[in-house]
Amino acid sequence: MIQFILIQNRHGKNRLSKYYVPFDDDEKVRLKARIHQLISQRNQKFQANFLEWENSKLVYRRYAGLYFCFCVDSTDNDLAILEMIHFFVEILDSFFGNVCELDLIFNFYKVSAILDEIILGGEIGESNKKSVLERIEALEKLE
């Protein structure tokens, strides 16, 4: 199960966070800072994108200046989550046309809606790119 998702830039600024298990506000602030500290110091050439953290695993991937980090149960498949991150970024790229950090800042509600189409209650719900894009485009027409 996915516990939370963080998207942060290289400077540690949070661009999107989504929690599927309850955390106190103080805990959220603490874990955002701690996770950025852990991930940003790792060498991508020599270290994997998986990290044991407390009683969970952090699976992350860096795209340009953004870190996409998923915190999952320790029993979840690391590679499946890594592929889910890539799938999410592919959908963002298709929807926004070469997504950048500014797209996440000014269209955070759309990014959140895309994430809600893919992940339901901390579990992967939809894995068909075309289906997700059709639903998001239908929501766009309603605006």
Curated annotation (Swiss-Prot):
It is found in: Cell membrane; Membrane, Coated pit. Pfam families: Clat_adaptor_s (PF01217). GO terms for molecular function: clathrin adaptor activity. InterPro entries: AP_complex_ssu, AP_mu_sigma_su, APS2, Clathrin_sm-chain_CS, Longin-like_dom_sf. SUPFAM superfamilies: SNARE-like. GO terms for cellular component: AP-2 adaptor complex; cell cortex; cytosol; intracellular membrane-bounded organelle; nucleus. It is a peripheral membrane protein. Keywords: Cell membrane, Coated pit, Endocytosis, Membrane, Protein transport, Transport. Adaptor protein complex 2 (AP-2) is a heterotetramer composed of two large adaptins (alpha-type subunit apl3 and beta-type subunit apl1), a medium chain (mu-type subunit apm4) and a small adaptin (sigma-type subunit aps2). Component of the adaptor complexes which link clathrin to receptors in coated vesicles. Clathrin-associated protein complexes are believed to interact with the cytoplasmic tails of membrane proteins, leading to their selection and concentration. This is AP-2 complex subunit sigma. It comes from Schizosaccharomyces pombe (strain 972 / ATCC 24843) (Fission yeast).
